[in-house]
Design a protein with these regions (language model features):
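Conserved Radical SAM active-site core
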Residues: 45-159
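Auxiliary Fe-S-binding modules of radical SAM enzymes
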Residues: 1-31, 55-57, 70, 83-87, ...
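N-terminal capping/lid subdomain adjacent to the active-site entrance of alpha/beta enzymes
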Residues: 26, 33-53
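Short linear capping/connector segments at secondary-structure termini
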Residues: 41, 153-154, 183-187
Length: 283
């Protein structure tokens, strides 16, 4: 389904969530048919020396937190890569690495190349509203041999969502390597309060506006099963950060894998597990 600029402007100004959601769902189905993907992620702390036990169920091992130095970041990458085996390893937020490069007075590209040599495959996230120069930083990431797991929004900078999404479209036109965009903010900006209605609307508008990024993603661990299920009906096609825990202490139906599959099916879609490289895992 192709939506014209005039139609986008009308939809963005509308409070008719049903019409907006239907248009976004049509756009998602044109790209992904009936499939919705999800990835099970093991988070490990950025501090070197911490335990890393990567279960076979994890499709991605993600290093989270702010490294204290380039040396500490590289040391942690080597530890995690060794423990992860063949499981893809991502790590860090690109804005934190910008600041680290500045504090150590080295080029960002040099820092990223060090991480790549240590074994890192992907930078875990790049918050478009936090980076000092999103295009330059992502270009440096690409030149360093790394990929980007997802473009994110840290805290909505304003209520002008279409303007933000047009910025994302322009960024992808410049860099061309963004595989997934997670439009819902990681933290709440007190100046831009959010509701469930707003979140659903933002997901739908993201799918309609950001036509040059394949995947619109929702963080399962951050936003929960209910919003994730609704988001899948209005344009989202991927669920990030599902727990790799296979235990069923509260019963099989409450186990993370069964719960995410059930929610995807409830959205009338086909659950498909992927890994951190977006390769489909054996079902």
């Amino acid at each position: 389904m192709t939506v014209t600029d005039t139609e986008l402007t009308t939809l963005a100004a509308s409070h008719d969530i049903i019409t907006l959601g239907m248009a976004a769902d049509d756009a998602r189905r044109d790209r992904h048919a009936m499939r919705a993907t999800f990835v099970r992620v093991l988070d490990v702390d950025a501090a070197p020396g911490g335990p890393v036990v990567a279960p076979p169920s994890a499709g991605e091992v993600r290093i989270v937190g702010v490294p204290t130095s380039v040396a500490a970041a590289c040391a942690r990458v080597r530890e995690v890569v060794a423990a992860a085996g063949t499981t893809p390893v991502s790590g860090f937020s690109l804005d934190d690495l910008e600041q680290l490069a500045g504090s150590e007075k080295i080029p960002l590209r040099a820092l990223l190349e060090d991480l790549h040599r240590a074994g890192l495959e992907q930078i875990a996230e790049a918050p478009v509203d936090q980076l000092s120069d999103p295009r330059l930083s992502i270009e440096n990431l690409k030149l360093a041999g790394l990929s980007l797991a997802r473009l994110t929004v840290h805290a909505l900078p304003s209520t002008d969502i279409p303007a933000l999404y047009r910025q994302v479209v322009a960024l992808q036109q410049q860099v061309g390597i963004i595989r997934a965009f997670a439009p819902l903010p990681r933290v709440v900006n007190p100046a831009v309060p959010t509701t469930g209605y707003d979140d659903v609307r933002r997901v739908a508008l993201a799918r309609l506006f950001v036509s040059n990024i394949p995947t619109i993603q929702v963080d399962w661990s951050l936003y929960g099963a209910k919003l994730a299920q609704v988001a899948l009906t209005v344009g989202a096609d991927d669920l990030d950060a599902v727990s790799p825990d296979d235990t069923a202490a509260e019963g099989r139906r409450r186990a993370p894998l069964e719960e995410v599959r059930r929610n995807i099916r409830a959205a009338s879609l086909e659950p498909t597990e992927r890994d951190g490289r977006f390769d489909i895992r054996a079902q």
